[in-house]
């Protein structure tokens, strides 16, 4: 076989092996399954809960909604004339889908200059930091997944203005985040 063909076959075999922790776990509707597949995630969520007070289930429901537990998640491309790529819809990236500017604020505020959005520990810590600020600025309880998600999506000022009230789709999504947090919480109570 030619050297080029061997390299191509090897590359194909390696690419089919999977993507480690940046690929999502299987069965995202089962918190216990996620915990078994990704014990590193659970350690990160518990560390965030200890530091910031945000319940594990609220963090998990937020990450599910934002990235489906994909560490390399990005927003879709925008297209001109339906075919010419014009860049991404926003700078959101990683598990938490944090925007560049908000991520920079987090790194400055926490002193975590090397924090990365595709690292589950950093992403969950970011969520804890952001939701704690939502509690402080907007009076949202840390276990209120619905309103925490609305503030997470709209920003603290947007939440304070009630910008989400004119977005029926977002209100529906926030209800889904709340339902998923309740589901995850009940599952985690059974599996420890």
Question: How would you label these PLM feature ranges?
Answer:
Residues 20-192:
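Catalytic glycan-binding domains that act on GlcNAc-containing polysaccharides
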Residues 13-16:
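C-terminal motif of bacterial Sec signal peptides marking the signal peptidase cleavage site
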């Amino acid at each position: 076989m030619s050297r080029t063909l061997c390299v191509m076959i090897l590359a194909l075999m390696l690419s089919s092996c999977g993507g480690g922790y940046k690929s999502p776990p299987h069965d995202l509707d089962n918190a216990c399954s996620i915990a078994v597949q990704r014990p590193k995630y659970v350690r990160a969520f518990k560390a965030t809960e200890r530091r910031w007070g945000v319940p594990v289930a609220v963090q998990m429901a937020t990450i599910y909604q934002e990235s489906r537990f994909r560490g390399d998640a990005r927003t879709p491309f925008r297209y001109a004339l339906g075919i010419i790529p014009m860049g991404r819809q926003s700078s959101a990236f990683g598990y938490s889908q944090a925007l560049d500017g908000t991520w920079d604020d987090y790194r400055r505020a926490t002193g975590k200059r090397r924090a990365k959005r595709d690292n589950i520990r950093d992403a969950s810590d970011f969520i804890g930091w952001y939701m704690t600020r939502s509690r402080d600025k907007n009076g949202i309880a840390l276990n209120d997944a619905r309103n925490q998600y609305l503030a997470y999506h709209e920003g603290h000022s947007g939440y304070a203005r009630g910008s989400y009230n004119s977005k029926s789709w977002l209100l529906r999504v926030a209800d889904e985040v709340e339902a998923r947090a309740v589901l995850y919480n009940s599952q985690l109570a059974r599996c420890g």
